[in-house]
């Protein structure tokens, strides 16, 4: 489970603090809005993995861990990503 915990305010052990670096406690690169946005905009087809650290599986995993706020979980990666745009729109409507 640790592999899917990124710098979103909580780490794999449940600490309520932001990571001090762009990496999570496992040393994996966290979701980055600039990186993700760039990759998403370059994607030829909707539904492709957002990046090597941001696949559909990881998005589902993060949603299950933090079901209350999908936009917070996915940080800045949602707005320009076809794969997750519908989920984000639904969440915003229900705010």
From Swiss-Prot:
Gene Ontology cellular-component terms listed: extracellular region
Cellular compartment(s): Secreted
Superkingdom assignment: Eukaryota
Annotated tissue distribution: Expressed by the liver.
Assembly notes: Forms dimers or higher order oligomers in a temperature-dependent manner in vitro.
Family to which the UniProt record says this protein belongs: Belongs to the CNF-like-inhibitor family.
Role this protein plays: Inhibits the enzymatic activity of basic and acidic PLA2 from B.jararacussu and B.pauloensis, respectively, in a dose-dependent manner. Also inhibits myotoxicity and cytotoxicity of BnSp-7 of B.pauloensis.
Protein name according to UniProt: Phospholipase A2 inhibitor gammaCdcPLI
Organism this protein belongs to: Crotalus durissus collilineatus
Organismal lineage: Eukaryota, Metazoa, Chordata, Craniata, Vertebrata
